[in-house]
C-alpha cells in the first residue's frame, strides 16, 4: 500500500473539525465515488441565544390537527366556511369545546370577538408557552395573545411562504421551529429562534433538504433530514453552539417509512415486509414484526411513535369502492406485543384511526369522529348560503385503552355552532 503524501498528512485540523461538527451530511452518490460527504447545513457564525437556557420542551403540532395544548386544555382553529375562522378551546376539566371568547351574547363573527380570525390569518398553527398563546399565520405573521385570546398583538412579519412545519421546541425564553420556504422546485428548511422578550427572530441554520424536529434533549434538538435522493439522517443540533452531531445515517431510506424519537428509528421495511427498530449507536436493527401482508406498492400511514408504542395503518383496495380497507397495528416497544386494532372513528362513512391531538397524564385527547356538517354562510345581500364539509369531534380515552384498541371515549361536548 502506498504511503500517504506529505500534503495529505498536513491537512489542517481545523478542516477536519468542521467536517466532524457538521457530520450529519448528505451521503455521497453511489454513481460518483469521487463526490465526498459535504455538510447540507449552511455554515454561519453562531448567534447568541438569550435567556435562562433551560432544558428544551417539545411542543407537538400535527398537520391534521394544527393546535397546541397547555396543562388545562387544547387550542385550535375551525373553518366557518366564510371569510373568517374562529379559535376554539377544549377544556380538559369541563370536557367542552367552546369559542375562545368570554363576551356574553357574542356572535363570534366580528373582529371584536377574541376568537375571530380574518381570512389572512385563518387556519394557522399555535404554540402555547407560559401565559401566552402564539399564532403562526399562513401569511408569515406571528401574533401573541393571552390564553383567553385577549390583548392580541402582531410581533413579527415574515415571508408569506415561510410556513410552520410541525413540532416546535421551547426553553422558557425562546421558541424554536422549522420554516419551509419553497422556491420553484427547491424547498429550503430554516431552523429559527424567536426570543419571547424582545421578539427578535434569528436564523440558526438552513438546509437544502426537508428537515423536521423529532425530539429534544437538554439543549439539543433531534432533527430528521430527508434528502432528494430519498436517503435520510438524524442529528442532534445544539441550539447554543449551533453545531449538529450525526447520530444515524440511512442510505436505503427510500425502502423504509417510519418515525424518529430521542433514542431510535422505528420503520416499515418494504424490502422484507417487516417492522424494525434501530437504537441509535447500535449497528443492527431489531425485527419487531415479520411477514406483513403488503407489497412494494401498498400505501402505509405511520400514526404514532410515543409512550413506547409504534402505530401504523396499512391501506388496501376495497373492490370498486372509492374508500379503502384499513388494517391498524400497534406495537408495544417494551414487550414486543402487537395488537392489530387501534381505536377507530367514522370519517364520513369511512373508517379511520383516532388521532392523538393532546397528551394528558393518563389519557389522550383524540379526534374520535369526523362528520359531514352543513356550514351556513351569510352573503353580502343578507341571504344564507349552505355548503357541506367535514367537522372533527373529540373525545378522551385512557392511554391503556388506546393502545389496546378499545374504543371507549368520553365525548367532548361542543358549544361551537357552524
Cite the ranges covered by each PLM segment:
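Positively charged n-region of N-terminal signal peptides that target proteins for export
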Residues: 1-8, 15
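C-terminal motif of bacterial Sec signal peptides marking the signal peptidase cleavage site
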Residues: 20-23
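Surface-exposed loop/turn elements that mediate protein-protein interactions on large endomembrane-trafficking
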Residues: 26, 37-59, 83-112, 141-157, ...
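Repeated scaffold domains used in trafficking and secretory/extracellular systems
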Residues: 55-71, 109-128, 161-172, 206-218, ...
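Generic beta-strand structural signal
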Residues: 69, 79, 92, 128, ...
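Residue position within the beta-strands of beta-propeller blades
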Residues: 74-78, 135-136, 176-179, 222-225, ...
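A generic tandem-repeat structural signature
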Residues: 123-197
Amino acid at each position: 500500500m502506498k504511503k500517504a503524501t506529505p500534503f495529505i498528512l498536513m491537512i489542517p485540523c481545523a478542516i477536519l473539525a468542521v467536517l466532524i461538527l457538521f457530520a450529519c451530511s448528505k451521503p455521497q452518490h453511489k454513481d460518483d465515488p469521487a463526490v465526498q460527504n459535504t455538510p447540507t447545513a449552511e455554515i454561519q457564525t453562531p448567534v447568541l441565544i438569550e435567556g435562562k437556557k433551560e432544558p428544551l420542551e417539545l411542543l407537538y403540532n400535527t398537520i391534521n390537527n394544527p393546535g397546541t395544548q397547555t396543562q388545562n386544555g387544547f387550542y385550535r382553529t375551525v373553518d366557518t366556511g366564510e371569510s373568517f375562522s374562529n379559535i376554539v378551546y377544549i377544556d380538559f376539566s369541563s370536557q367542552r369545546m367552546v369559542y375562545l371568547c368570554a363576551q356574553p351574547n357574542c356572535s363570534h363573527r366580528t373582529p371584536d370577538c377574541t376568537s375571530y380570525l380574518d381570512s389572512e390569518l385563518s387556519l394557522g398553527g399555535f404554540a402555547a408557552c407560559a401565559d401566552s398563546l402564539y399564532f403562526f399565520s399562513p401569511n408569515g405573521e406571528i401574533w401573541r395573545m393571552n390564553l383567553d385570546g385577549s390583548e392580541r398583538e402582531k410581533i413579527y412579519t415574515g415571508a408569506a411562504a415561510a410556513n410552520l412545519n410541525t413540532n416546535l421546541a421551547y426553553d422558557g425564553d425562546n421558541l424554536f421551529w422549522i420554516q419551509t420556504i419553497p422556491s420553484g422546485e427547491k424547498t429550503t428548511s430554516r431552523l429559527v429562534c424567536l426570543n419571547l422578550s424582545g421578539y427578535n427572530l434569528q436564523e440558526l441554520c438552513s438546509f437544502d433538504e426537508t428537515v423536521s424536529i423529532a425530539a429534544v434533549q437538554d439543549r439539543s434538538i433531534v432533527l430528521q433530514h430527508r434528502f432528494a435522493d430519498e436517503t435520510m439522517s438524524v442529528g442532534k443540533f445544539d441550539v447554543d453552539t449551533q453545531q449538529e452531531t450525526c447520530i444515524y445515517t440511512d442510505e436505503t431510506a427510500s425502502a423504509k417509512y417510519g418515525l424518529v424519537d430521542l433514542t431510535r428509528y422505528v420503520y416499515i421495511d418494504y424490502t422484507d415486509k417487516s417492522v424494525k427498530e434501530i437504537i441509535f449507536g447500535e449497528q443492527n436493527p431489531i425485527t419487531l414484526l415479520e411477514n406483513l401482508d403488503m407489497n412494494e406498492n401498498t400505501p402505509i400511514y405511520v400514526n404514532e411513535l410515543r409512550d413506547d408504542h409504534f402505530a401504523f395503518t396499512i391501506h388496501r383496495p376495497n373492490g370498486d369502492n372509492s374508500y379503502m380497507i384499513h388494517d391498524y397495528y400497534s406495537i408495544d416497544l417494551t414487550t414486543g406485543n402487537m395488537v392489530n386494532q387501534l381505536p377507530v372513528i367514522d370519517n364520513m362513512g369511512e373508517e379511520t384511526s383516532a388521532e392523538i391531538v393532546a397528551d394528558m397524564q393518563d389519557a389522550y385527547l383524540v379526534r374520535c369522529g369526523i362528520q359531514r356538517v352543513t356550514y351556513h354562510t351569510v352573503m353580502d345581500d343578507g341571504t344564507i348560503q349552505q355548503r357541506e364539509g367535514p367537522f372533527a369531534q373529540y373525545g378522551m380515552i385512557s392511554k391503556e385503552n388506546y393502545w389496546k384498541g378499545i374504543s371507549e371515549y368520553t365525548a367532548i361536548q361542543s358549544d361551537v355552532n357552524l
